[in-house]
UniProtKB/Swiss-Prot annotation:
Its main location: membrane. Belongs to the PRM5 family. One of its GO terms (cellular component) is fungal-type vacuole. This is Pheromone-regulated membrane protein 5. There is a cross-link at residue 314 (Glycyl lysine isopeptide (Lys-Gly) (interchain with G-Cter in ubiquitin)). The chain crosses the membrane at residues 78-98. Residues 238-247 have a biased composition (Low complexity). Residues 250-261, 309-318 have a biased composition (Basic and acidic residues).
Length: 318
């Protein structure tokens, strides 16, 4: 018979059990002798005991330190940690997608704006430049150029001559001044400096007007008609007229000394071509057709010519 006593505790423990074994044996021997005799049986008792250890898990009843995991799946801790890490990763991925998309849209909008601003079809010649003054912008939008079919065959040769003259006189200074999208105060002479000199701007405009006077043919642009069939002056005539008005101040003599040209300009082939009878006729026709502004050339003698005439005894008018 084995008796096990278990104490109620929260931790496993070793228990000792005692077992008793009783063995009873009896033997009887009967010897038959000629004479009859009898013997008593012998009784023997033996007792043995052994200790058997056993592990008993603690009960969760009334024990707050044992989690009741009967309703939860296995690996709950790993599932929770993985879910938190996944949420963080998805948040970072969503933020990256949103910022990339917004920056891409901003870049595209900037590129579209720059392509509109600096493309050949959105310059100030088409009236779409925001840097142009509003009256000049309206002037360019209302211009309608005469087609090639409207030019008579007799004028085509003269137009070819005009083109040759314009190429020989180098139109680059004029184009550089017409195409600049800045105000007239920022000229070629002072645009690299933060200081804007009114005197320098007047000198710059005066040099331009003198250059126009020496090359009247360059002032003649194709006849431009507005929507009201009224001829308009070009930007060249506008600039030359505004610069000519600036010569009325007291600095006219000082400015004139600064812009004198050598005498070889008067003897250039382009000058002879401009002074030829055919060129004068074409100038008159262009005047009657477009009423364009032509500035009469009025040049002062060069210092060398003035000294020669003074030595020869000739009087020169200032």
């Amino acid at each position: 018979m084995t008796v096990i006593t278990i104490a109620k505790r929260g931790l496993p423990k070793l228990t000792t059990s005692t077992s008793s074994t009783t063995t009873a044996s009896s033997s009887s021997t009967i010897t038959s002798v000629x004479s009859s005799s009898s013997s008593l049986p012998l009784l023997s008792n033996s007792t043995s005991s052994s200790i058997i250890p056993s592990i008993t898990p603690p009960s969760r009843n009334g024990n707050p330190y044992i989690l009741d995991s009967g309703d939860m799946p296995n690996g709950t801790v790993f599932i929770v940690v993985g879910g938190i890490a996944g949420v963080i990763f998805l948040a970072i991925l969503l933020w990256w997608v949103i910022t990339t998309y917004s920056s891409h849209r901003l870049t595209r909008s900037v590129q579209d704006y720059e392509s509109k601003m600096f493309s050949x079809q959105h310059t100030q010649f088409y009236g779409d430049s925001p840097y142009m003054d509003y009256p000049a912008k309206e002037n360019f939008q209302d211009q309608v150029h005469i087609s090639e079919s409207d030019i008579s065959p007799g004028n085509k040769d003269e137009s070819v001559k005009d083109a040759l003259v314009s190429h020989t006189n180098n139109e680059k200074p004029f184009l550089s001044n017409f195409e600049r999208p800045l105000s007239s105060l920022v000229s070629e002479s002072n645009r690299n400096s933060l200081f804007i000199s009114p005197t320098g701007d007047i000198l710059y405009k005066t040099r331009l007007s003198k250059l126009y006077q020496e090359s009247p043919r360059l002032l003649q642009k194709p006849v431009i008609m507005t929507s009201d069939n009224v001829s308009t002056n070009s930007l060249v005539s506008t600039i030359s007229s505004s610069s000519a008005s600036s010569l009325d101040n007291g600095n006219e003599k000082e400015v004139g000394e600064d812009i004198r040209k050598p005498a070889k300009i008067a003897s250039s082939p382009s000058r002879k071509l401009l002074n030829s009878p055919e060129s004068d006729g074409s100038v008159n026709r262009n005047h009657s057709k477009g009423n364009l502004l032509v500035v009469q050339s009025k040049r002062k003698p060069t210092p060398s010519t003035y000294l020669e005439h003074m030595l020869e005894g000739k009087e020169q008018d200032e």
